[in-house]
């Protein structure tokens, strides 16, 4: 059943879609709290996303486990009041059944959010069954047709964070094609860094925007644009950079004679390191 309650005005939904089809790719910075969101909007970014890792780690909770459902929704309500278009990372959807995920999406839509990011990676390091994930996308689009659903496949991401070998591009393409048929408005393939593969997927998708996670040292905005990428996400990069800068600044005050690191970007804490910060609050960290 289509949700007819108050939400973003149709022109906001349309405006967000248009950002994916402009002359240049949409650069989407990802906030983790009210202050980071407001700072990005003040800088002039027309659209912002949230980072599930940043939201989770800032709350002392593990990422990608559904633990931040309430916090994510509360944050979304707050930052949706800013003069920018907001899309929210809802991990796997914060629900087991498709209708539960659709209810979360409808709640966010009522709050003024214009898009959601839904991933198929599961906490146990496996991919959700393809049919189940398609049912989730279909349920969300049926409930809130105007909401931009960015369907994320973790075929490459799970391999990257687990130290494994990514599957063939055909495996990723199979999921992508199914998600588009289910109604996805955009496709996100984090940890896909090979330029040939990026260009191939972008070409195959045609009018469906391909979203790539920006990887410092591997990507440039201009090159991704040349490859046909329509949306470039920062993911947890800004959160990790903020953590690193804060720690290094504090250290430099106490140790004024110690030179700064030569390559700040290369030495940023990685996803696993940032995610492990939550262990210090759950009893799984150092003793």
Task: Name these PLM-found stretches.
Residues 3, 7-88, 93-234, 241-247:
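Alpha/beta enzyme core
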Residues 2-9, 237-287:
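Extended, intrinsically disordered, low-complexity segments
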């Amino acid at each position: 059943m289509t949700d007819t309650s108050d939400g973003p005005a149709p022109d906001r939904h349309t405006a967000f879609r248009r950002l994916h089809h402009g002359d240049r790719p949409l650069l989407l910075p990802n906030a983790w709290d009210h202050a980071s969101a407001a700072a990005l909007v003040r800088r002039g970014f027309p659209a912002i996303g949230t980072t599930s890792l940043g939201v989770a780690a800032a709350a002392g909770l593990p990422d990608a486990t559904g633990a931040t459902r309430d916090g994510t929704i509360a944050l979304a309500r707050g930052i949706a009041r800013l003069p920018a278009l907001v899309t929210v990372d809802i991990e796997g959807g914060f629900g087991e059944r498709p209708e539960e995920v659709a209810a979360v999406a409808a709640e966010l839509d009522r709050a003024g959010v214009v898009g959601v990011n839904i991933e198929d990676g599961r906490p146990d390091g496996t991919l959700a069954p393809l049919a189940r994930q398609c049912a989730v996308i279909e349920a969300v689009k049926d409930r809130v047709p105007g909401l931009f659903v960015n369907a994320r496949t973790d075929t490459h991401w799970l391999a990257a964070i687990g130290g494994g070998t990514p599957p063939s591009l055909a495996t990723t393409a199979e999921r992508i094609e199914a998600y588009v048929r289910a109604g996805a408005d955009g496709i996100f393939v984090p940890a896909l860094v090979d330029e040939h593969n990026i260009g191939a997927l972008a070409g195959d998708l045609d009018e469906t925007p391909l979203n790539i996670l920006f990887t410092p040292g591997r990507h440039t905005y201009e090159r991704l644009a040349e490859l046909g990428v329509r949306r470039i996400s920062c993911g947890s990069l800004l959160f990790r950079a903020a953590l690193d800068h804060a720690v290094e600044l504090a250290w430099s005050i106490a140790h004024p004679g110690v030179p700064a690191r030569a390559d700040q970007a290369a030495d940023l804490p990685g996803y696993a390191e940032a995610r492990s910060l939550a262990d210090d609050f759950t009893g799984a960290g150092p003793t």
